[in-house]
Amino acid sequence: MHHALIVARIARSPAQDIAGVFAASDPGELRHLVGVTQRSLFQFGDVYMHFIEAGAGPGPRIAKVTGHPEFVDISRKLEAYVSPYDPQTWRSPRDAMGRCFYHWERD
């Protein structure tokens, strides 16, 4: 399994509003295009963390679907709740992905 962690800033709105955006989207086509098998959303203060598990590295697949109507719709809806962690360096979704520097998995 491959993982990705997307990090951003979260507004002071209910986290359930963000969860609702993904709950409405997850039955659709987009998760299949990206290969998402699991999604978890976390909040720590004003930090939003979006953990994705996928069969293959999701980063390149996300980059390929940024123009897909479902991706555009989700992005538009999330603008009210989520903003780039560092707006000065954000250019694409890839800029919001954390870099894994340690991973352990049991045998």
Curated annotation (Swiss-Prot):
Domain of life: Bacteria
InterPro entries: Dimeric_a/b-barrel, Polyketide_synth_cyclase, Polyketide_synth_cyclase_sf
Gene name of this polypeptide: curG
GO biological process: antibiotic biosynthetic process; polyketide biosynthetic process
Protein name: Polyketide synthase CurG
Keywords: Antibiotic biosynthesis
Pathway where this protein functions: Antibiotic biosynthesis; curamycin biosynthesis
